[in-house]
């Protein structure tokens, strides 16, 4: 089980996360409360012992180019409706691995229909990893019935409302490739070592 703990804002948080998680993420050029300047992101990326995804809602190719060049990121996570052609371009130009995020509704009236629509959209993008999220770092869970159907077709990373108390249930239900957490392992707005450790332990120990 691939476990990513996203939204580190400092070297102190990175030190906690990289003890336990397979990957982390640093948010730039976004309205997120976890947003950090590009120079800070570069320092986190260069100091890390695990992969650090450069996470952003940027839409323009030029903005992604500047961010990748300034931070020397090798992994990026796109949370916007960019043109599908951007992904192969960034891969060819910078050699980055790309996680593309897609939003899943919190409640679906027709999970099968919504899953098929989502799969059609996902297949337009040449991403290395697919993230299914509730969107905008909401800390809320989406309709897992949709995610489960998508996960039967392609490997997905699940995010949105995850925490130590529910990660086992989500993994057993959805059977994803991985899970991604941010606010669910924070206390007072900072990554908490006890919560990070417990989240990773529970995620890794699930028998599917």
From Swiss-Prot:
EC identifiers of the protein: 5.3.1.24
GO biological process, one term: L-tryptophan biosynthetic process
UniProt pathway: Amino-acid biosynthesis; L-tryptophan biosynthesis; L-tryptophan from chorismate: step 3/5
Keywords recorded for this protein, A-Z: Amino-acid biosynthesis, Aromatic amino acid biosynthesis, Isomerase, Tryptophan biosynthesis
GO molecular function: phosphoribosylanthranilate isomerase activity
Short name of one Pfam family: PRAI
Reaction catalysis annotation: N-(5-phospho-beta-D-ribosyl)anthranilate = 1-(2-carboxyphenylamino)-1-deoxy-D-ribulose 5-phosphate
InterPro entries, per database record: Aldolase_TIM, PRAI_dom, RibuloseP-bd_barrel, TrpF_fam
Family from the record: Belongs to the TrpF family.
HAMAP family for the chain: PRAI (MF_00135)
Protein name, as recorded: N-(5'-phosphoribosyl)anthranilate isomerase
Organism: Pyrococcus abyssi (strain GE5 / Orsay)
Gene designation per UniProt: trpF
């Amino acid at each position: 089980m691939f476990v990513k703990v996203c939204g580190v804002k400092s070297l102190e948080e990175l030190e906690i996360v990289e003890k336990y998680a397979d990957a982390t993420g640093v948010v730039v050029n976004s309205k997120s409360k976890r947003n950090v300047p590009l120079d800070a992101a570069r320092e986190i990326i260069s100091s890390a012992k695990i992969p650090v995804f450069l996470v952003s809602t940027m839409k323009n190719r030029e903005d992604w180019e500047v961010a990748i060049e300034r931070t020397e990121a090798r992994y990026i996570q796109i949370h916007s409706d960019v043109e599908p052609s951007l992904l192969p371009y960034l891969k060819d130009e910078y050699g980055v691995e790309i996680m593309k995020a897609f939003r899943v509704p919190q409640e679906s009236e027709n999970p099968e229909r919504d899953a098929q629509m989502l799969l059609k959209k996902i297949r337009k993008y040449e991403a290395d990893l697919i993230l299914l999220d509730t969107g905008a770092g909401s800390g809320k869970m989406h309709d897992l019935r949709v995610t489960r159907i998508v996960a039967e077709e392609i490997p997905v990373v699940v995010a949105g409302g995850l925490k130590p108390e529910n990660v086992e249930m989500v993994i057993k239900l959805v059977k994803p490739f991985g899970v991604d957490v941010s606010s669910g392992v924070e206390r007072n707005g900072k990554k908490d070592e006890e919560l990070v450790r417990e989240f990773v332990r529970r995620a890794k120990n699930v028998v599917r």
